[in-house]
Amino acid sequence: MSRAISLHSVSKTYGRSSRAVDRFSLSVAPGEFVVLLGPSGCGKSTVLRMIAGLEEVSEGELLLDGEPSNDLSPRERGMAMVFQNFALYPNMTNRANIGFPLKLENPRRDHTDRVESTARMLGIESVLDRYPRQLSGGERQRVAMGRAISRRPSAFLMDEPLSNLDAKLRNHLRAEIAQLTAELGVTTVYVTHDQAEAMSLGDRVAVMRGGVLQQVSTPREVYALPENVFVAAFIGTPRINLLQAVVHAPLEGRMSIDLGRQRLPLPEPLSADHQLLRIQQGRPIIVGLRSEAVRIAPRSQARPGEVALSGIVEHVEYQGHEALVHLNTGSRPAVVPDLESARPQAPQRRRARSGGTGVLERLKQRATGSVAVLDHPAEESYAVRSPDRPAVTASDLVVRTGPDMRLRTGGQVPLLVDLAHLYVFDHSGRRICPLPRDIPGLDV
């Protein structure tokens, strides 16, 4: 029987001040597939281990089928874990590995039928009498999954099970896992740092940063309606373009967004979203544009809701079926600290312990603070100059285009921006618009 899992304000603390998970709340319905997604070190595996009973809950409450379960042993929880390193016994055959948990439960019973039916389900019946060392990585992972399935657990807990496999095998096993869990109808919590896995597998995706839950939504909603800059930047390939900007909302005249050297005029009459931007007049904001929201085309080809910009081609990445064009529009990128480094700065001396902020405190501030940084570089930061070579500009916008478009590095190209796909975040990184109702086909 599938199990309902609920975590209410769960925290995990190591020592006195190291907080790996901070007030994490999540409910997983019976039979649901939920993915915990985030960068390395964000606390997603710690959450999984607390659900399994391998880590104690420091604060908060874990409920299994509505019953308090903080003090239950791992065996009493009736769950099965699948790890990235397979965790198979090398001195046992694959048959013995799959049947090992069954033998522990009932040593006298013959478990051959269940082991073989599990192997048939996974397509590994022909390798049951071999040893793990004789298998490929994909076959070993199937054996590890078979060992978990044979117990008929109330929930699967999968900790990056595909991370040690090559890309082709990952894609194949990803499809198998999706099909298998759907057939079994077992509650599944899956940990990964790979957004492709999360978006293709999960009924819902829970995005984490610094031990804090950022957003829990369907894959479509996480992509279309990110709660903040971190979620927007972490979901999507290529990464969303994030630019520093300021709203100009004169009493008379057209409202616009100032990107530095160019402006985005907002079409009239203003939409409900754009009306809300009036209260941001003069304040720093972050504009988000995914690569599909911008196209290379002259102003004469503008569709309703599109406005014109221009950019200088800095670099073109040929991808086969498409090309990614890196452009400089004279804008200032916004930095998401967890995903990229800010501009290099001169090294600073270490502060004395008594007067400075400790490493743990700085990590805590980063985990609970704003998710974006609005730096204010000097005007010359648009170009890096050297005495013996010309200025080199940095790209601030990535646009998708067809593979056959001929573009010259250093050439200026006309751009059209679809304002229906414009994201605006406040200075701390929280989304201001769009509102949920403005996303076509999205039911919230």
What kind of region is each of these model predictions?
Residues 6, 27, 63, 414-416:
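ABC ATPase nucleotide-binding domain
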Residues 37-39:
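The feature captures the beta-strand-to-loop junction immediately N-terminal to the Walker
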Residues 52:
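Helix-to-loop junction immediately C-terminal to a conserved catalytic motif
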Residues 55-63:
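Conserved post-Walker A/P-loop segment of ABC ATPase nucleotide-binding domains
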Residues 61, 67, 212:
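ATP-binding/catalytic-site motifs of ATP-hydrolyzing domains
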Residues 74-235:
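ABC ATPase nucleotide-binding domains
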Residues 251-444:
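Non-catalytic connector elements of ABC transporters
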